[in-house]
Regions:
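A binding-site-centric feature that preferentially detects glycan-recognition modules on secreted/surface proteins
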Residues: 1-112, 116-182
Length: 182
């Protein structure tokens, strides 16, 4: 899905209205022209648009996601980016079969774990890759050794938690390249 279509996807959920913008104002407030960094080619080939001007708990409401962890109380390990951006990720296969802790220990130098808001954005933009799967956010802690995850059922999504060393079938860690584009 193109970045322009991803932005339109968020518009369809009313993100522009939440920000007090018209559709045109919202479209003009973000960049749709992004170029994949050469070092990401073949590793992080999926661009995804992340909206950070709306708090995660409000995005969850707009998107109709069931919140079983109280998103407002999550702890993010990555520095929070305070502008909308495009990040580059994979199709969930990069760390297939690994626990969250195993994923940490196998990060590439150019890689970081996704936060819950990034996992949500990825799932909204690439639903066909996510349906029937659990997607771990290895940079967002729920409590102790439990991390935020998004479970993508056929008809709905739920924000839940997943233990750092659990190897549940059909759970995947989402990571991305460290660089993002404003």
């Amino acid at each position: 899905m193109t970045i322009k279509n991803q932005i339109k996807n968020f518009i369809s959920y009313g993100f522009h209205k939440y920000l007090g913008m018209t559709v045109t104002e919202y479209m003009n407030s973000v960049s749709v022209n992004v170029i994949q960094p050469e070092k990401y080619q073949g590793i992080f080939d999926y661009p995804f648009f992340v909206e950070t001007r709306i708090p995660i708990e409000e995005q969850i409401k707009l998107l109709g996601i069931d919140d079983y962890v109280n998103a407002a109380n999550l702890t993010h390990l990555n520095e929070q980016i305070n502008f909308p951006y495009v990040a580059w990720t994979h199709d969930l296969s990069l760390h297939a079969g690994k626990t969250i802790s195993e994923t940490y220990s196998s990060y590439l130098e150019i890689e970081t774990g996704c936060t819950a808001i990034e996992v949500i954005a990825f799932a909204v933009h690439y639903p066909s890759l996510c349906k029937g799967r659990g997607i771990d956010a290895p940079s967002t802690i729920f409590r102790g050794e439990y991390f935020a995850c998004l479970i993508a059922h056929e008809e709905n999504y739920e924000l839940a938690s997943h233990w750092i060393d659990d190897r549940t079938e059909n759970f995947y860690c989402l990571t991305r390249g460290k660089e993002v584009t404003k």
